[in-house]
Each structure stands twice: as C-alpha cells, then as structure tokens.
Regions:
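A glycine-biased structural micro-motif
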Residues: 22, 47, 78-81
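Active-site-lining helix/loop region of Rossmann-like oxidoreductase modules
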Residues: 104-163
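Rossmann-fold NAD(P)-binding glycine/threonine-rich loop
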Residues: 53-99
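Glycine-rich, N-terminal phosphate-binding loop of Rossmann-like dinucleotide-binding domains
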Residues: 28-31, 54
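N-terminal Rossmann-like NAD(P) cofactor-binding module of classical short-chain dehydrogenase/reductase
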Residues: 24-27, 51
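Short, conserved loop/helix-junction motifs that constitute active-site signature segments
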Residues: 41-48, 76, 99-100
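General beta-strand structural signal in soluble alpha/beta enzymes
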Residues: 14, 80-86, 131-134
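Conserved N-terminal Rossmann-fold NAD(P) cofactor-binding segment
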Residues: 1-25, 33-44
Length: 163
C-alpha cells in the first residue's frame, strides 16, 4: 500500500489495519466489498468514530435498498458513524484545500448528530469547509454514485469563501 499512498500525495501514510484500529477516528477507505472484513477486526466499535469515505459502485439491490452509507453503518453498529470525504477523488483530497481564498467543501452526513461535530472539526483542521447534508439517507441521495444514477453533488469540486 505504501506506493499507492505515495502516489496520492505526501500527506497520505499507509498503515496496517491493526495500527489504524488503535486510533479513535478511523477513515474507512477500502474497496467497498471489504468493509465487512474491517468491521470484524474489532469485537466492539464502541468509542470509535468511523468516517465512511467509500463509494459503492454496486446496484441498489445489493444494498438492501439502503444508501451505501446506511448499509455500511450496519456493520459498525456501536461506532459513531459519519459519511464524508467520499465525493472527491483521492488526488483532489490530497491537494491543498485552500484555493483562491476559499476552502474546498467536504460533505458530511450521519444519523448521530453528536458524531458530526468532531468530524467537521477535523475537516476544518485539515483546511476543508465541512457542509452537513443531514442524515445518512439524505446525504446519500445527494452524493451517491450508483450505475447510471448519480447524486447531484457527487464529484462536485466546490469551494466556500470565508465569511
């Protein structure tokens, strides 16, 4: 993974799953089909915040009719679960988020309002402008990439000026 991480940018560091699981906040950025294996790596996700940065390029039938984020959240039942950082390609996320006096937008959604605030703070610390899209099903409708039907905000590289 180290060569792939370096190809994305100098701030991306590859970690083993075991090392990553020691963190309180974990960005889930694996091939979509692997999320269940990651979920099995801990007996309980209590006390952990999981940020789902994946996109499921699978038919909705494979997701039990749920947005991909709600489907994935079912595997991390005791975690604080937030969908975010998924609507832009990795190279864009690795680039400087401050552009022409504005901050690159990242969208966040969660069914747990208490989980969003620390993830929004992390996004700001990284230089992004977090925009809350509501609950997982609301955000999922706006940023999904599924077959030929894509959400209106997927891959939109937006900027927010300081106010």
């Amino acid at each position: 993974m180290a060569p792939q991480a370096r190809a994305i940018g100098p701030t991306v560091v590859a970690k083993s799953l075991r090392d990553a699981l020691e963190a309180d906040t974990i960005i889930l950025a694996v091939p979509f089909g692997e999320h269940r294996e990651v979920a099995k790596a801990l007996p309980s996700w209590k006390g952990k915040t999981v940020i789902d940065a994946m996109n499921a390029l699978v038919p909705v039938e494979e997701l039990d009719g749920l947005p991909s984020s709600a489907f994935v959240a079912n595997s991390f039942t005791s975690a604080k679960f937030v969908k975010g950082f998924n609507h832009l390609v990795a190279a864009t996320l690795a680039a400087d988020p401050v552009v022409e006096g504005g901050h690159r937008v990242v969208f966040l959604s969660s069914d747990d309002e208490d989980a969003i605030a620390p993830v929004a703070a992390l996004a700001k610390q990284l230089g992004f402008a977090p925009v809350k899209l509501g609950k997982l099903n609301e955000g999922g409708a706006l940023v999904h990439a599924r077959g030929r039907t894509w959400g209106q905000l997927i891959f939109q590289d937006l900027f927010k000026k300081e106010q």
